[in-house]
Amino acid sequence: MNPTLVAFAGFVSWSLCLLVLMEAIRTNLVATKAVSANGFTPDNSNLSPFMQRLARAHANCVEGLPIFGGLMLIAVVAGKSAVTDPLAYYFLAARILQSLVHLSSVTAMAVTLRFACFTVQMGIGVYWAVRLFLA
């Protein structure tokens, strides 16, 4: 696989990892009778701050997947992955780092770092979009 497809697969897999983690914790909460099976909200607002951050980190991935994943797939399908390959791993690293920071803290420094990671992703996405239109 080329770097673009590896990054796309990594993005999808990372999103899946966050989902599996969230559902494993939810399953444990139900099994231990800490929360009833129908006692969950989509944003985990009735659970711990970590679970709320996990729900948001997963949602961030799902929200970004059609945009950034779409650009990667367009590049591959159009035979233009030379546009996306050079920055594909940087994109994936910024995505994963954003999620990890999101999970770890909500301090001002963490939010700033998280935003910086997202800014890197947006910059790469805009660059890819422009280059794909011009290619």
Label each PLM-derived region with a short phrase.
Residues 70-93:
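Short alpha-helical packing/oligomerization segments
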Residues 27-31, 80, 107, 111, ...:
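Transmembrane helix-loop junctions in multipass membrane proteins, especially transporters and channels
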Residues 2-40:
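N-terminal signal-anchor transmembrane alpha helix
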Residues 59-73:
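Core segments of transmembrane alpha-helices
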